[in-house]
Amino acid sequence: FPASPVVWDSVDSISHLFEQAASQSRSFFGKFVTRFELPRTQKAEGNLICSFDQVLVTSTTDKNALLKLTPKDKRPSPISVLPNGVDLDYFQPNSDIQRDEETIVFSGKMSYHANISMVKYLVDEVMPRVWKVRPAARLIIVGKDPTPDIKAFAENPLIAVTGTVADIRPFLWCATVSVVPLLYGAGIQNKILEAMATGTPVVTTSRTLSALEAQPGTEILVADTADAFSAEVLRLLGNKTLVHEI
């Protein structure tokens, strides 16, 4: 019998993630450990993309990042982009729950260094600007395995850290805005897909757009500085018309 074709579902480029984390992460692991692991990861991924009949990734950015790692003496396998999806029967709007105009939500595994960096950026840079205008605004950090420094944010009465939850949807339904200030990353941000599927407006950075088909300004709000990011969050808080439109 002929050999069966072998497909590597890479999902994303880990070395591309590490390359960004080495310079931009706000966590010890993200900055120092990934810097140490980067050369080995680049070499491993470069060899892997030449070792299969087909390679799958979730975004064009990751495809291009992998192709750059191809050894000079080898030919890369075909790489196809297969974006992540979301279960629209599970993640959908819920008109029975009224959104709290002061609630902002962030979701993700809170031991993951990219998520830790995002939350630290939110707490240190974005939320102080939001609180100057809306002092009652609340940030809810939803996700399992929060590190001690993330848990410590809950000492602020305007910040909640949930840890593991059985169902993310109620937190998305009650929030006026989902925030994803991606400083570095790879692949598709599933947290954005889930929020959009529940009808929760998303404010994010331009780094997420290459993996999404959302239109900035009409389907998603985009800002790359703390001033601009907080301004977009404030645009949504208390503006039911805009919340409905995004």
Which residues does each PLM region occupy?
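Conserved catalytic-core segment of nucleotide-activated headgroup transferases in glycan assembly
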Residues: 50, 68, 81-174
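Short hydrophobic beta-strand element within catalytic cores of glycosyltransferases
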Residues: 191-194, 201-205
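Acidic donor-binding loop of glycosyltransferase active sites
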Residues: 53, 170-187, 198-201
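Short acidic/histidine- and often glycine-rich active-site loop of Leloir-type glycosyltransferases
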Residues: 206-217, 221-222
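Short Ser/Thr-rich beta->loop micro-motif in glycosyltransferases that lines
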Residues: 163, 180-185, 207-208
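Conserved acidic donor-binding segment of nucleotide-sugar-dependent glycosyltransferases
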Residues: 220-227, 235-240
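Acceptor-binding helix/loop patch of EC 2.4 sugar-transfer enzymes
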Residues: 4-43
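A short, active-site helix/loop in glycosyltransferases that binds the activated sugar's phosphate group
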Residues: 42-76
